[in-house]
Amino acid sequence: MQDYKQPLRIGVGGPVGSGKTALLEVLCKTLRDTYQIAVVTNDIYTQEDAKILTQAEALAADRIIGVETGGCPHTAIREDASMNLAAVEELAQRHKNLDVVFVESGGDNLSATFSPELADLTIYVIDVAEGEKIPRKGGPGITKSDLLIINKIDLAPYVGASLEVMESDTARMRPTRPYVFTNLKEGVGLDKIIEFIVDRGMLDAK
């Protein structure tokens, strides 16, 4: 019988550079005084994202595990999630009252999804700099994630992207699922993300 709490596992996916690690940094810093949090990061050959979070002092180093997936990072969150499941288990044993473990996927494309064995909730991050066409390209990250984050809205004028078009396309691609427009560097939209995590994750409001 396990002697530790089963934490809520939240998968965070999205293309390289969309803001996944930035999202985790700000979420950890905002939530860590209220909830017991840990993070698993995935990189193909390094533990770069784990180092970034540690150096940013988002969490104590013993609350972050970097998984080196090798090969295809999609496999490590979907078809064979064993390394990630083991990392979540290790963190839950190390910190027996964990409320949340965030699992950040390696940089992936729009078709990557998390195994339901690994993630109870999924958040997918795209960014305005990729162009306003990204939402209408679809893919499971856009259409099936529990929350879609459209980040870097401050860059819209510089890349010729219309936020109105992006919102219209997003609403059409995921008519019943929530989405948030954010500028994580400035904290814009962060309150809505936290509200989603607390409500959908059924965390005790504190």
From Swiss-Prot:
Q: Where does GTP bind?
A: 14-21
- Keyword terms of this UniProt record: Chaperone, Cytoplasm, GTP-binding, Nickel insertion, Nucleotide-binding
What's the short name of a Pfam family annotated to this entry?
A: cobW
Q: Which InterPro entries match?
A: CobW/HypB/UreG_nucleotide-bd, P-loop_NTPase, UreG
The record, for HAMAP family, names: UreG (MF_01389)
Family, per entry: Belongs to the SIMIBI class G3E GTPase family. UreG subfamily.
Q: How does it assemble?
A: Homodimer. UreD, UreF and UreG form a complex that acts as a GTP-hydrolysis-dependent molecular chaperone, activating the urease apoprotein by helping to assemble the nickel containing metallocenter of UreC. The UreE protein probably delivers the nickel.
Q: What is this protein called?
A: Urease accessory protein UreG
Lineage start: Bacteria, Pseudomonadati, Pseudomonadota, Gammaproteobacteria, Vibrionales
